[in-house]
Amino acid sequence: EKALLDWLEEYADINRHICGVEQYRDAEWLLSDADGDYGTLRSFLSARHFREFTEKEARLSGDSQNAEAVRLLLEDAGELLAWMRHLPYYYETERQILVHAGIAEWGGEDWLCVTSEALMVGKTTVSRGNFYKDVIAGHISTAKISGDRTYDGIWSDGSSHYYLDGTTWRSGKIPVLEYDAETGRYRER
């Protein structure tokens, strides 16, 4: 965890992580994990703590499950989560908007004026079609978007939208979208 924080700090101007940490303040996200087996929670917890949580969860109420998950999260990844709270909700370049979940595209060039932080971290609908900038997001599983449960790569609509949430917990692969500023083209690495 410390090595990751040091690396991210060193390369902060090159590597941008668009924060979705607001969702960690209200732990409901833990109980509605799209992969059905707490994949997000598992990614933050040690194997011992994840096993401890799954052994207890059936005996706990929803609120108690959340409290226990948060307790374990803070114990295992508290420093990382605290650091993530300081990250921006979006990052904008001349050509792209990078965001955790999505934006209110109906606002056009005024999208920022009409997009709430809740939408930036919790949007669950897929946007398709042309937009004046490319929108690069995660949050929604590319397996779900593509309709292929085994798909774990980057999904694009061929216009202005790229989704990166590629079930890393299963594949062991982190989808990376590379942009070539000279050609204006993207490629998956």
Language model region names:
Residues 1-189:
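Feature recognizes metal-dependent phosphohydrolase scaffolds
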